[in-house]
Regions:
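Catalytic core of carbohydrate-active enzymes
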Residues: 129, 462-473, 480-492, 513-523, ...
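Catalytic and substrate-binding clefts that recognize carbohydrates or anionic sugar/phosphate headgroups
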Residues: 42, 87-280, 287-289, 293, ...
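Boundary at the C-terminal end of the N-terminal hydrophobic targeting segment
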Residues: 22-24
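Aromatic- and carboxylate-enriched substrate-binding clefts and catalytic-loop regions
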Residues: 64, 73-75, 143, 159, ...
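Conserved, mostly hydrophobic/aromatic
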Residues: 49, 101, 212, 303, ...
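A low-complexity, Ser/Thr/Gly/Pro-enriched, surface-exposed linker/loop concept
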Residues: 35, 50-94
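Short, well-ordered beta-strand segments enriched in hydrophobic/aromatic residues
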Residues: 47-49, 59-61, 97-104, 131, ...
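Bacterial N-terminal signal peptides
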Residues: 9-20
Length: 790
């Protein structure tokens, strides 16, 4: 049963809270003052309204007026507050806030009533607040009919559990809310309860909380609370957010007439998604771990000898002498500067793993402890993770402390990155050591449960920008929060199992993560965890495992699994091979697998002009280019819950094979267009399921009518200038494609310098393709490049 408190009790509790807040923790940062359009009194509930442009509105509800008028929390770019688009009209029927894009109506306070028997026996309920939001067409798209503040004591702090409840029409579907790996195919969150809280050990795979929900009704809700949050999606006619800690309900509603405009609004609120260095779109080679400088270099050289494209080599953990020593073991890596120079001479980049934990015996622990730069317990002592689990030994850096962030960056730069490494990999950004029950510098870690990845990664990202201001940054990160996309990080689904089931979970997981505004997501190709002793294959493997026994042992179907996973990875925003096994390279799984893997590696590189142009579109719009089908086909009811296939850019429909021994697959082709099988050029009308052949060397892949796909020349890495060798046109509809390029490494693109764009337009009636250049480079001569697929 809900807990409720009266207005008087609320105010007493809030006053007590202000007097005693965080006795065991440092004083929280003072809130940033804001100027709402209005702050409404609803008989004990204060409601503040702020605009962030014409299609974004913030609603804040609290029992204390000052809380209701406090600025937004972490992750939100409050400088984009802009109330000028809204007109406020107050009447006996309530208060309305109207712009060209939306209207918000807050109902008037209810008439006084005689308390019920229940209200006399239990605590009186909060003053009700009800509101409705309509779109520009006057359609009601969102109704909030309840809110809650339940008093509690968390971590010694008197506070509240807060929440809001919304009507859930039967035809509404919900997406986003970060990374949840529980589904093997269903995409719609409706009917599910999502615990939006970072959790490395979630049974199906790591959970990551990005509290941004997008509705099929063409609006999004950004839930402004960093504590652990439960999202109840369309159960018993209601949708609700319930956060563990807070003094207010605060959320943003973004309204638009198309999906991409919602993501533009999200980018306005939380930051644009930068274009990564071009190397990020190539193959990233990693394993746990390369145990010497020679071993890492030999892998890079083998890629070169075999002429398999490669862009990045990764040095994973335990290259150090001790966790938190922040050094490079000279016995294994005697000259990291020379190692990185050799990689650079081969046209490659390097990534190095840097962890946020410090063993008590490491050289920096005492310094960090004395300065208060680590996560603390209620007595103010630095927390050692060793009692919780052997591999969590040490204290955790506190990224909420600006001085601790600066210290971490300075030492990561000077001790590690300065040895020629290009980019950092920030592992354990949930973090592994669950912070609940402990304290950050800004207060109870329960209050800020989901905040670590944003502040930790942003601290390093900002440091990289200052250190190398002309160079585009790149960071690998295992978790995210509101605004994490602005750090330029590439995210992945953590330490997943090397199994067919885990592979099937990746597709809906990734689609809801990109729907959460995190465009650059991937996974460990092949799974991270160690292989089981024996195979569980029920069918004869489609890949001959001969030559792979030293890697796969008796898991004879693993070369098949790795091949299918790599085929899928070819059509992910980032393609990164990783895993806790002897070898992970393309030649490690036998000659039969190697041939197919090399072909897909080369295909990925031929598609980089298409990929990179899609990345520019994401930078401009905020919308992801790995897209669930509902984004591009909102009027097709068949795709609302379809999480086994997706769009990769605007042209490709990808349907990965996720079952062992499978040689054909049922694929749904959305309505409203026709489709071409990429491999056979066979055409299909949309709006139906088909069964398509899926031999081991073919991932089911279709191209939408009207698509224009630029194909690049064969290159060994993106360090080589890539030419356009072909422009494929899939007729049947008019179409256009904005071909984009830049130097691939600098920040010039962000200032509209050093870029080239060519608008390619297909006229289906005349069967002609035209190219309009921006004039910054010689016009693309397209006549000899055009290939019409019929």
């Amino acid at each position: 049963m809900k807990q409720f408190i009266s207005r008087c009790a609320q105010l007493v509790a809030v006053s007590h809270l202000i007097a005693t807040l965080c006795l065991a923790a440092p004083t929280p940062v003072a809130p940033t003052p804001v100027a709402p359009i209005a702050t409404l009194d609803r008989e004990g509930a204060w409601v503040s309204i702020d605009g962030y442009g014409p299609n974004i509105i913030r609603i804040t509800i609290a029992a204390d007026r000052n809380e209701a008028r406090t600025g937004p929390g972490y992750g939100i770019l409050s400088e984009h507050l802009d109330n000028t688009a809204f007109k406020h009209v107050s009447s006996a029927n309530g208060d309305s806030f109207v712009s060209a894009a939306l209207s918000l109506h807050v109902n008037p306070a209810p008439a006084p009533h005689v308390p019920s028997a229940g209200e006399k026996y239990f605590a009186p309920q909060l003053a009700p607040v009800e509101l409705q939001i309509k779109n520009a067409a006057g359609q009601t798209i969102l109704t909030m009919n309840d809110w809650s503040m339940a008093p509690q004591t968390i971590n010694g702090e008197k506070t509240y559990q807060v929440g809001a409840t919304f009507a859930a029409p039967a035809d509404e579907h919900y997406y986003g809310m970060g990374q949840n790996q529980e589904s093997t195919g269903a995409l719609d969150l409706r009917g599910r309860t999502i615990d939006c809280a970072h959790w490395y050990e979630a049974p199906a795979g790591e959970q990551v909380c990005v509290p941004f929900m997008v509705s099929s009704k063409s609006y999004g809700i950004v839930w402004d609370n960093a504590s652990a949050t439960r999202f109840i999606a369309g159960i018993n006619g209601r949708t609700a957010f319930q956060s563990k800690v807070g003094e207010r309900v605060s959320f943003f509603v973004i309204v638009a007439d198309n999906i991409d405009a919602i993501y533009s609004g999200y980018a306005r609120l939380t930051g644009k998604t930068p274009i990564p260095p071009k190397a990020a779109f190539g193959l990233i080679q990693s394993k746990a771990r390369y145990d010497s400088q020679d071993a890492l270099l030999e892998v890079a050289k083998t890629y070169q000898r075999k002429q398999y494209p490669l862009d990045v080599m990764v040095l994973d953990w335990f290259y150090w002498t001790r966790m938190g020593q922040m050094d490079i073991n000279p016995a294994e890596f005697p000259d990291p500067d020379a190692m990185n120079k050799q990689l650079h001479d081969m046209g490659l980049k390097s990534i190095v793993s840097i962890w946020p934990r410090f063993e008590t015996a490491s050289r920096y622990f005492n310094e960090l402890d004395s300065k208060g730069y680590l996560l603390k317990d209620k007595d103010g002592k630095s927390v050692d993770g060793l009692p919780f689990r052997f591999d969590r030994t040490g204290g955790l850096i506190d990224p909420t402390n600006p001085q601790a962030r600066a210290w971490f960056w300075d030492h990561a730069r000077d001790n590690i990155l300065s040895h020629g490494f290009d980019y950092p990999w920030l592992d354990e950004t949930e973090p592994d050591l669950v912070p609940d029950g402990f304290f950050y510098s800004i207060g109870s870690a329960d209050r800020y449960h989901n905040l670590f990845p944003l502040l930790h990664v942003e601290g390093v990202a900002n440091g990289m920008r200052v250190w190398r201001p002309e160079q585009r940054g790149l960071i690998l990160s295992r978790a995210a929060y509101l605004g994490s996309q602005r750090t330029g990080a590439l995210f992945w689904s953590s330490d997943i199992n090397p199994s067919w089931e885990a592979l099937s979970r990746q597709i809906p997981t990734g689609l809801n993560m990109t729907a959460s505004g995190i465009a650059y997501w991937g996974n460990d190709i092949g799974g991270w965890q160690s292989l089981p002793q024996t195979s569980s294959a029920l069918k004869a493997p489609l890949i001959d495992p001969t030559g792979a026994s030293d890697v796969v042992g008796q898991n004879n179907d693993y070369p098949e699994l790795f091949t299918r996973w790599f085929e899928y990875g070819t059509f992910l925003p980032t393609l990164r091979v990783h895993g806790d096994r002897k070898h992970t390279e393309l030649w490690a799984f036998g000659p039969a697998a190697e041939t197919i893997l090399a072909d897909y590696d080369k295909l990925r590189y031929r598609l980089i002009p298409y990929l990179y142009s899609s990345a520019k579109a994401t930078f401009d719009s905020g919308a992801p280019f790995m897209r669930a089908l509902w984004m591009d086909f909102p009027n097709d009811p068949q795709v609302s819950d379809l999480g086994t296939e997706y769009m990769f850019g605007r042209a490709f429909l990808v349907a990965p094979v996720t079952e062992q021994g499978q040689v054909q697959k049922d694929v749904y082709l959305p309505s409203g267009t026709s489709w071409t099988n990429y491999w056979t050029n066979e055409k299909y009308t949309g709006g139906k399921w088909i069964t398509v052949a899926a031999p081991i060397q073919q991932i089911p892949l279709f191209v939408r009518d009207g698509s224009i796909v630029p194909i690049g020349s064969a290159i060994q890495s993106t360090a080589t200038k890539q030419l356009i060798t072909e422009i494929r046109v899939y007729p049947g509809k008019d179409g256009e494609f904005l071909l984009y390029d830049d130097d691939g490494t600098s920040m010039d693109y962000a200032h509209n310098k050093g870029t080239t764009t060519t608008l390619l337009r297909w006229n289906d009636a005349t069967q002609s393709l035209t190219a309009v250049s921006d004039g910054r480079a010689p016009a693309l001569a397209i006549t000899k490049l055009i290939k019409i697929i019929k």
